[in-house]
A protein has these predicted regions:
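Phosphate/pyrophosphate-binding catalytic cores of soluble transferases and nucleic-acid-acting enzymes
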Residues: 1-160
Length: 160
């Protein structure tokens, strides 16, 4: 069976990154022909909603030193791609994931999806179909002063 991606998931600080990096290192040191593989190495794609932010290294489990195995840096993607305070959502993650995934596969490399943000992982593994939705400031302003009961009534009216 041809593998198109390996996924490693789990909670924060459970050793996912070091496992993914060690696995990528092993794959990178193999000759694909020797094991019947079709890939030339491996790279890691992060699936973490907080590691996308630059400078947020403490408390996010962004152990960048884990990406160096036996003195060689394992290439990684979707880490440190946004400034703190920038809104980054599931739609954007999914688009960035597909860009990284397609680039990696195009080069004949095996992607390793690694992280603990379940919704990010599920969105790519199950192929969620998402659409960009522009911000509607007028609607936000109209709803900002409503309490929960008023919002609930409005939602029920929309459903009927």
């Amino acid at each position: 069976m041809k593998q198109t991606m390996i996924t490693i998931l789990g909670p924060t600080a459970s050793g996912k990154t070091s496992l993914a990096a060690a696995l990528a290192s092993k794959i990178n040191n193999l000759d694909a022909a020797s094991w019947g593989g079709t890939t030339q190495g491996a790279e890691i794609i992060s699936a973490d909603s907080r590691q996308v932010y630059r400078g947020m290294d403490i408390g996010t489990g962004k152990d960048l030193e884990d990406y160096t195995v036996d003195g060689k840096l394992i290439p990684y993607h979707l880490i440190d791609i946004c400034e703190p305070g920038t809104k980054y959502n599931l739609f954007e993650y999914q688009q960035d994931f597909y860009d990284a995934y397609l680039d990696i596969r195009k080069r004949g490399v095996l992607p390793i999806l690694c992280g603990g943000t379940g919704l990010y992982i599920e969105s790519v593994l199950k192929g969620y179909h998402l659409s960009p939705v522009p911000q509607n400031q007028e609607l936000r302003d109209r709803l900002a002063d409503k309490n929960l009961d008023e919002l609930t009534v409005m939602l029920k009216e929309l459903k009927t």
